[in-house]
Every structure is written in structure tokens, then in C-alpha cells.
Amino acid sequence: MKKVFFLFSMVWIVTIRGQNSFSTHIIHSLESKIDSIVQAGIQNKAYPGAQVLIFKHDSVRLNKSYGFHTYDSIVRVENHHLYDLASVTKILASTLAFMKLYEDYNIDLNRKVSDYIPLIKNTNKKNSTFMEVLSHQAGWLPYIEHQKTVRRKNGKLKGRTLSSIQNNRYTKPLTDSLFIHKSYKKKIMRRIKRTPVEKIGEYRYSGLLFFLLPDLVEKLSGQSFDQFLDSHFYDPMGIERLTFNPSFKFPKEEIVPTEKDSLFRKTLVHGWVHDEAAGLMGGVSGNAGLFANASSLAKLLKMFLDCGQFEGKQFLKPETLELFTSRTYPNSDNRRGLGFDKPSLDSIPSERYPSEKCTTESYGHSGFTGNLVWVDPVHQCFMIFLSNRVYPTREQRALYRLNIRSSLLDEAIKADLAF
């Protein structure tokens, strides 16, 4: 009997050691593949540096930084450094806050947005519903280039726009040396109000509602947009490196720069939001403005993956997340959820965005500065890719040409670590 027990124990030990060895091999194999893809991007000047975080099944399998802040190779990217999230802000700030409003204030998604936001009550947008606008099917314009309205033909700044001197009229910084007139936000709102509406019922991406959501948050909750997010999500989840206007909180050497802007700001955009409209909103906006490192974002995505729960606390109801992250109009050619992006509907798997490996239940969002966050609940996986592909200019297109984000997501999903 003792011999049998001894032999069983030895087999169990060998099996466990074999499993641990197999696990280590898979992790090293995943890291090697990710390294190869990211380094190829750096070598082809898709971006000077990046962060990648991959969570699979039960733990973080990779959390790594690559390259430098810029191509001069002076400041190496580290895991605590912050990237400009661009439109990823739409799901990790404005949609996140709106989901909480939906729960706490019983918002009816089929009611008109104008019932909640009086700004558009007597406009061509008065009949648009939250369901339509959040899924980009209301015919609203994609974007307004506000930055093209602040300078005269001779290049000088117009009155009540920007100033190189901060005072009681020009209060909020756009950059270290440009300050925004306190009434400029009203101009942005008026322009949104007056934009045309085209082809209601057809899918057309629009970011305009996300400029309006922060005011809705304040109207219903009594808290500013950033305070609401901090108090309901970021602070109780222990997220310390996720913020608007990072220059107020962190040293510049911990913030990755974006673009050498020769047209609008006429300086390197560093520590301030890259998106021009969000910048003119004072850096706090629902369309863009968040900065973070990958580790901070992982907590939010883990909460999404765990049906609204994080470390034993329920932040959102499972049914809320399921509603917002599912296709809103599944019988149409619109792939979108409510605020969230979804896989494209291409019939050829190799052409499917963002990856041929991700399931139809997956969701996430990309960002213009070179980011992607994606959650796949079926594979119990999420991936975070942060980069500054717009350095030195937004004309850098190698990130798209090399299909880097899709390749990374392919590898993240393929790395089956359940054994």
C-alpha cells in the first residue's frame, strides 16, 4: 500500500511539474511572438514605443513596455508611463459613466436624447434616441474641426479663442503656452447643435454625442464628469494612473508625447490631449482626453470581463454590460454596440476586424493615437495595446499597413493557457 501511495505521489508531482513547465513554455512562446510583432513596428517606424498587456483565463500573461517615447531614444518606455488614449476614452469614460447613469437614473434608451439634453431640443437632432446615437445610426456628423476656426488667414489668433497669457478670461491650458477662453466651450456646443443630420438609420460613426455626455453626468449626479468617474469607478478600484490632464498630476517624463503639431498648436503635444476638440474643451471630454498606462486599464477590463464585478464589489450590473456590449441592431449591417465597437461583419475571416480569431461576443475600441483595447468573454481574454503612432506626425500609417494590432490580438487569443 505504501508503495502504491509513493508511486501515486511521484506521478502527481511529475504531472504538476510538467504542467508548470508547459505553462512556462507557453508564456515564453507568447512573449516571443508579441516581442517580434511590436519590435517590427518600431523598426518600421509605426511608433517609437508601446505597451502591451494580455490577460488570459485567470491572470496577466504579459505586461511589457517597448522602445522609447520618441525616435531619439532618450526616454525609454516603462510600465508606469502614460499614453494618450484618444477615442478609447469613449468606452472607459463617457460610456462607462453613462452605463452608471442608465442604472441609477432609469434612463430609457429608446427615449429622445433631447429629453435629457435640452441643448438639442429644438434642433434637427431632437428626435434622435440614445439607442440610435450611441450605436452611430442617427445620422450625426462624425466630427467638427474646431481647430480650423481659431486663427485668421494671417495665422493670428481670433478674439475669445486662445491666448499665450493665462488670466481670468483665458483660464484652461491647451498646451504649456496656450490658454482657452472661458466661453469657448459654448462655441463648441453651438456648432454641435447646428450640424446637419444625414441618412438616419444608416451606420455612420459619430463622436458628437460624447461631447454632450459630461454635462448630462453633471446635471443628473451633481458631480463633474471626472469627479463622477473617480468616485464611482477609478478610486474604489484603486486605479491611480488613469486621468484627464495628466500634466496636473504627473511629471512630463512619465507622459508619452504625441504629435509635433505644426498647424494648430505649433508645438510638440506633450502632457496635453492630442485630440484638438477635446483640447479646446479644456482636456476633459467624453470623446477623448484620458491618459493611462496599460496596468490601470486592465482593472477596468477585468471588471468588464467579470460581468461588472471587481475584487468582490459590483460596479455595474451584468445585464447592463451585456446590453451595451452586444450589437444594437443585429439584423442590420451595423456592427456596433452602445458606445462599444464590435467585430466587423466581413464574411471572409482573414478580413475581419479587429481579428479573425475574436468571437462575435467580443468588444472594445481603438484610438487615433495608436491604441486598441479588446475584450473577448468567450476566450476569457483581453488585450491592451498603447502606442503613440502619431509621433512625429499623424501621417505615420505603418501601424495600419503592418496590421499590428490585429496580429497582436490574434496571438493573445491563440495563446490557450488552460491546461
Give a label for each model feature:
Residues 17-38, 154-172:
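Sec-dependent signal peptide cleavage junction
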Residues 108-123, 236-237:
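Short, glycine/proline-biased beta-turn/loop segments that scaffold the active-site neighborhood
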Residues 51-53, 63, 84, 132-135, ...:
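Structural recognition of the beta-strand scaffold that forms the well-ordered cores
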Residues 1-25:
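Bacterial Sec-dependent N-terminal signal peptides
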Residues 365-419:
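Structured C-terminal helix/loop/strand segments within mature extracytoplasmic catalytic/sensor domains
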